[in-house]
Every structure is written in structure tokens, then in C-alpha cells.
Regions:
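Canonical Radical SAM [4Fe-4S] cluster-binding loop centered on the CxxxCxxC motif
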Residues: 30-69
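Core AdoMet radical
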Residues: 57-68, 79-93, 103-122, 127-148, ...
Length: 271
């Protein structure tokens, strides 16, 4: 049985978070009415050396850094709220660890999102952050699913491999299959570099999207967990696989209902 990491009341419902990352919501009402965001995506920098052709953040090696140690909203965070810390290569931010320590003091659950190459090259650092309970989950953007990469990912219970609808290939999926891995499918964002890449390689992207659309049931059978952001849910029509009762049970809500986005680089926010 999964151990409980924490629980809290948010509006008219209770949230329970288990140590394997499972989240359970319970309410006696007809619908969930939150008072604050359960999950906050935080962009802390726009600096990255990977140059990904579809990068919707348009990150560059000389990108700006957010002033993350002087963010007043951090003081309003509640125990067991979740922060997904990302944007560029977060490991290049000199204030990352002090920021994570501040979140730990507030009992906030911090997760990191980073590129596969940055994860593999800095695995010792990542392991240290997990051992110190400065982070709990890691989201790893896939680039090359090697056996060595799979071996490394399997060491971390709360590691989730991120792939993009239209970028991930059939061969990638087959390589990752049957290793008890967790995968998050992100919708293709047609903004910034994503727009340019779509114009250049539209046929290739659409073919990959069609393969994924037609083979979703394969993923359900061959991965431990398959999850989606709301854009991927729409693009892949995930609702077709669920009964109304299942949809009501598993769907976590539209963007903005219990989520929030903060860009510390440009000092903007959105639901």
C-alpha cells in the first residue's frame, strides 16, 4: 500500500498525495471547487544549450535567468502544494538549490523538469537533490531512448519521461516499452520555434501524430503509467477510451481550474 506524503484541504475537497506521486481528491459535493492552485508550473530561466527545434520557450545558451529568491508569491505557498520547476536548463540557474531549500522549508513538493542529456550528465546531482528531499519527481524530456538511459530512469520511482505528440517516433515508443516506465505525453505547441518547425516538417509531424493517435492502446498496455497534458488530451482525443464515469474520475480539470503558470524571467503569470 502506498504511503501518504501529505494531505490538505482545498476549498470543498481534500487532496491526498502518496509517495509514488499518486494524487487523490475527495469531496462530498457535486464538483471540486478549489481555493488555490494545487500545481504551479514555474519557469526559472530561459537558458539552455540544447537548441531543440520545437522549443516553444525559444531558450538559448545566453537566455535570461529569473530572480527566483525574491518572488513574493513563494511566501503564500501552502504545505504540499506542488511546483514543477522548469524552463531551459534549470541546473544552470545559480540560485536553484537555495530556491529548493526555501520550498522544502515550506513543505512544498518540488519537481524538476529537464532535458534527457542534462539528466544523464548531472545524475549524481539529481540523486543528491532527491536524497536531500529537495525534489521529489523528475520530468525528463526524451531525446534518445538508449538502454543506458532506461536503466538510469528505472532507478527513480517518481521519474516520468516526457514526449511530445508529433516529435516522438514509433521507434522511441517501442524502445521504451515493457520497462515499467511512466510516460507523459505533451501536446504539440504551435508557437515560437514550434511554429517554424511545423512549417518545415508538417508531413513528418502529422504522420507521427497519426501513428500515436492510432496506437494509444499499445501504450496503455506497455507502460506502467501513461498521462497527458490537456493539449495532448485534445489532440489525441483521449476521451474516446473512457466511459463518462471513468472520465469524471480521472480527468484533473481544465487548465486554470487547479493549476497556475508563473514565468519568473518575464515576470508574468497565467492560469
Amino acid at each position: 500500500m502506498n504511503k501518504i506524503m501529505g494531505k490538505y484541504k482545498n476549498g470543498n475537497y481534500q487532496v491526498i498525495i502518496q509517495k509514488d506521486g499518486t494524487k487523490i481528491r475527495e469531496t462530498q459535493e457535486e464538483q471540486f471547487l478549489p481555493e488555490f492552485a494545487e500545481n504551479i508550473d514555474v519557469k526559472i530561466c530561459n537558458r539552455c544549450d540544447m537548441g531543440c527545434v520545437m522549443c516553444h520557450e525559444d531558450s538559448t545558451p545566453n537566455g535570461k535567468l529569473g530572480d527566483i529568491l525574491n518572488q513574493k508569491w513563494v511566501d503564500s505557498l501552502k504545505p504540499y502544494q506542488e511546483l514543477a520547476v522548469g524552463g531551459g536548463n534549470v541546473l544552470e540557474h545559480p540560485d536553484l538549490i537555495p530556491f529548493l531549500k526555501k520550498l522544502k522549508e515550506k513543505q512544498v513538493i518540488a519537481n524538476l523538469t529537464l532535458h534527457q542529456e542534462h539528466f544523464e550528465y548531472n545524475e549524481k546531482l539529481i540523486k543528491g537533490l532527491i536524497d536531500e528531499k529537495l525534489i521529489y519527481g523528475i520530468g525528463i524530456s526524451l531525446s534518445d531512448p538508449t538502454i543506458e538511459f532506461i536503466r538510469k530512469v528505472r532507478k527513480y520511482q517518481n521519474a516520468v519521461i516526457h514526449v511530445i505528440n508529433g516529435i516522438v517516433k514509433e521507434d522511441d515508443i517501442k524502445m521504451l516499452s515493457d520497462h515499467s516506465l511512466k510516460i507523459l505525453i505533451l501536446g504539440y505547441k504551435n508557437i515560437r520555434r514550434g511554429t517554424l518547425y511545423l512549417k518545415k516538417e508538417e508531413t513528418l509531424i502529422r504522420d507521427r501524430q497519426k501513428w500515436l493517435y492510432d496506437n494509444m492502446e499499445y501504450l496503455f498496455r506497455h507502460f506502467k503509467v501513461v498521462s497527458f497534458d490537456n493539449l495532448a488530451i485534445e489532440q489525441l482525443d483521449i476521451k474516446r477510451f473512457l466511459t463518462k464515469e471513468e472520465w469524471d474520475e480521472f480527468y484533473m480539470g481544465d487548465d486554470g481550474t487547479s493549476t497556475f503558470y508563473i514565468d519568473t524571467v518575464e515576470r508574468t503569470f497565467s492560469k
